[in-house]
Structures are given as structure tokens and as C-alpha cells.
From Swiss-Prot:
Gene name tied to this protein: hslV
GO CC annotations on file: HslUV protease complex; proteasome core complex
InterPro entries named in the record: ATP-dep_Prtase_HsIV_su, Ntn_hydrolases_N, Proteasome_sua/b, Proteasome_suB-type
Protein name from the UniProt record: ATP-dependent protease subunit HslV
Activity regulation as described: Allosterically activated by HslU binding.
Species for this entry: Klebsiella pneumoniae subsp. pneumoniae (strain ATCC 700721 / MGH 78578)
Assembly mode: A double ring-shaped homohexamer of HslV is capped on each side by a ring-shaped HslU homohexamer. The assembly of the HslU/HslV complex is dependent on binding of ATP.
Amino acid sequence: MTTIVSVRRNGHVVIAGDGQATLGNTVMKGNVKKVRRLYNDKVIAGFAGGTADAFTLFELFERKLEMHQGHLVKAAVELAKDWRTDRMLRKLEALLAVADENASLIITGNGDVVQPENDLIAIGSGGPYAQAAARALLENTDMGARDIAEKALDIAGDICIYTNHFHTIEELPSKA
């Protein structure tokens, strides 16, 4: 699978992801970019799960952002509704972590839109490791959001066999 982590701290929000794509137990590619900017660079998003499914979801989410003039929560709820009710979309297997200057959200195929505690998101196979590392760093250091996300990904990459050390990182200024 993968690891995606999002951290919000001191006026910055970051989403970072590794680059490993696997097919079964074989590494197919090591430099996949699973994090990208959407909606005129005002939203950042990362995915965990099937690559083709995730790109479909990115496209659908960007359409929802355009329909709702960039309102992250409304776009996320509308995507989750469609994802839950549309037969074709229900077959897509991916999770999205999305953020703008105000909010960080997880969007799931079950129709869930979750705003996590402490604006910390970690999804994918290495998510629990990245979340534990990022939480410890948030609570015990003065490190910035980008440094925390990078270190959390490094730790997840050392532990999770489906996570590598090729990182893609996107960052936005944050009001939250």
C-alpha cells in the first residue's frame, strides 16, 4: 500500500507521501507521486490505495471543489456521498487525505469525512507508524510541520515493507 501523512503546525499544513507502488508482493515502481495540488494550488491531497482508483478520485474531487468554489468540506462531503451511493465508485479502493488553509480531512469509500484530532492524518499501510511518530514529535518537540511529516515518513519507511523513502511533499500556509 503506502503511507500518507498530514501535519498542521505554526501556520503551515503539509501532506507528504512515499513513492512505492506494489503489485502483490512485488515493488513495481519506487517514485510514484501520491501527493498533489488541486484547485488552483489551494488544496493539497494524498492517496493511499489503488493508484488508478486514486487518480479517478482526485479528478472527481477536483470537480467537486470547482462546483463548490473551493469549499473543502462541502466538496469532500459531496464526493463521499457520490462514492457511497454510485455503484461504480463504490468499487474504488482508496483513501484520500486532503487539506486547505482551514481544515484537514480524511475521505473514505464508506462515505466518511473525518476531521481528525490535532489536524494529524496518517493513512495507508504505514499510517499507524507515521501517526505514532508524528504525534510524538508534535507533543514533544518544536519541529515544524514539514520536518515532522518527513521524519514520520522516514520512520514508517523503516518499518513498513510497503513504504519507501522516496517522498513527495506539498505544503500550504495555514490559518488553523
